[in-house]
Each structure stands twice: as structure tokens, then as C-alpha cells.
UniProtKB/Swiss-Prot annotation:
InterPro entries reported for this sequence: CYB561/CYBRD1-like, Cyt_b561/ferric_Rdtase_TM
Residues the entry annotates as binding heme b 2: H77, H149
PROSITE patterns on file: CYTOCHROME_B561 (PS50939)
Residue spans crossing the bilayer: 17-37, 42-62, 76-96, 112-132, 144-164, 191-211
Keyword Heme: yes
Cofactor binding, per record: Binds 2 heme b groups non-covalently.
Record carries keyword rRNA-binding: no
Needed cofactors: heme b
Gene name in the database record: CYB561D
One cellular component term from this protein's GO annotations in UniProt: membrane
EC number: 7.2.1.3
Bilayer disposition of the protein: Multi-pass membrane protein
Protein name, entry field: Probable transmembrane ascorbate ferrireductase 4
Binding site for heme b 1: H44, H110
Organism, scientific name: Arabidopsis thaliana
């Protein structure tokens, strides 16, 4: 069991602070500014931003700060990603239920990017479970798939944030043109601040995931792990 390097917690702390700003912003925007309360229209941004983006970001950071065995980290990572996937699916369902139709919703770049990001996330979760949790896969297969799992996970996370940004722009454009929301009003400023917070959050989470300084295992631990799990060759 490796100890947590205090220097590694700096980016995690910044990620938590930016995530808190994002959560407060989307809650304030969805529940208080339109004066609609909790409804299907307000559930969509809440589930997609807090349930999908924030929870999946926390799942990525699990490997950077959580002390314990690799099995414990993988289990927490798996369950958090499963929660994020469930929130994303439910968030899409609320949009369909609110607009009364499936095909009527798929007309914009935001809708197509959302479908792509959730589909990739679901495929990533299933393949990750089969490769790293299910014991049927051989060690060499998991080792080969690991770089692709990391890359596709970060790509999908970035795509989800980009999708949220297009959704914010689409919604703000509608509010300003159809409902005469002031460009410098509180709602416009809140949406713009939410977009900046999401961009900052994505940058911090991805940086913490790819920088060697913030990886959870030391070099000596990796060498021991590699020597123990290296497949043996049978001589003929």
C-alpha cells in the first residue's frame, strides 16, 4: 500500500474547488433563475453536469489520491463511473420526456455530441469492466488495452465537457433571442461562468491524469509490480 504524496493533492484540491464552483453555478442557474423549480427541464443540466461530468471526473482522480490497494481503487473507479453513466442515461431521458419525442431532439450539434459521448462512455465502461475487473482476461491483454483505456477515457471526458459547452451556448442563445434575457443579466453571467468553470475543471482533471508527477504509484512500486506480473515464456 503506497502513501499519498502531499504534492499530488494540489491539483486534486484545485479540481475539487472548480467542481464546487461548477456545482453551485448549475444548481443556482437551474433551480432559481428560471423560477421553475425542480422539473424535467431543469433535471437535464443537473444530471449531465453534476451526475455525469463531476462524478466521472472524480472517478478519474480516484487513482491519484485514494490510498489503498489497486483492487480497492479499481472498485471505487468502476462504481463511480457506473453512477455517472446512469446519470447520463437518465439525463437524456428527461430531455426526451420534456420535449415529447426522440427525433425532435436530435437536430443540433449539442444533441449529436451528447449521444456520441454517452455511447462512448458506455462502451468504455463495459470494456473496462471486462478487461480490468473480470478475471477472464489474461494479463497481457489488460496490459495492451490499458493505454487505450486511459486515452479513450480522457477523450470521452473532454468530449462530454465540450458537449456541455455547446449546450450552454445553445441554451443561452435561445434565452437571449426568444425570451429577451439581457446579455449582461445575472442569468447570462451565470451561464458564462458555468462554461468557464467547466473548461477549468476539464483542464485540471486531465492534467492530473496525464502528468507522471501525479500518478499514484512510485517508480519502485511499478518495477516490483511489473516483475511480479511479467508473463513467463516457456522454452521449447
Amino acid at each position: 500500500m503506497g502513501s499519498v504524496d502531499p504534492s499530488r493533492l494540489s491539483l486534486v484540491l484545485f479540481a475539487r474547488l472548480s467542481g464546487l464552483v461548477v456545482a453551485v453555478s448549475v444548481l443556482y442557474w437551474a433551480l432559481f433563475l428560471p423560477n421553475l423549480g425542480l422539473s424535467y427541464s431543469t433535471l437535464h443540466p443537473l444530471l449531465m453536469v453534476i451526475g455525469f461530468i463531476l462524478v466521472s471526473g472524480e472517478a478519474i482522480l480516484i487513482h491519484r489520491w485514494l490510498p489503498g490497494s489497486r483492487k480497492t481503487k479499481k472498485a471505487v473507479h468502476l462504481w463511480l463511473q457506473g453512477m455517472a453513466l446512469a446519470s447520463a442515461v437518465f439525463g437524456i431521458w428527461t430531455k426526451f420526456h420534456y420535449q415529447r419525442g426522440v427525433f425532435a431532439n436530435f437536430y443540433s450539434l449539442h444533441s449529436w455530441m451528447g449521444l456520441l459521448s454517452v455511447s462512448l462512455f458506455a462502451a468504455q465502461w463495459v470494456t473496462g469492466f471486462m478487461s480490468f475487473w473480470h478475471r477472464g482476461e489474461v494479463r497481457t491483454t489488460r496490459t495492451t488495452f490499458l493505454p487505450w483505456h486511459v486515452f479513450l477515457g480522457l477523450y470521452t471526458y473532454g468530449l462530454a465537457i465540450a458537449t456541455a459547452e455547446t449546450g450552454l451556448l445553445e441554451k443561452l442563445t435561445f434565452l437571449q433571442t426568444k425570451r429577451n434575457v439581457p446579455r449582461r443579466g445575472s442569468e447570462s453571467m451565470t451561464v458564462n461562468g458555468l462554461g468557464l468553470g467547466l473548461a477549468l475543471l476539464g483542464c485540471i482533471v486531465i492534467t492530473a491524469a496525464i502528468l507522471p508527477k501525479y500518478q499514484s504509484h512510485s517508480r519502485d512500486e511499478k518495477l516490483v509490480y511489473s516483475s511480479q506480473d511479467r508473463p513467463k515464456c516457456l522454452s521449447s
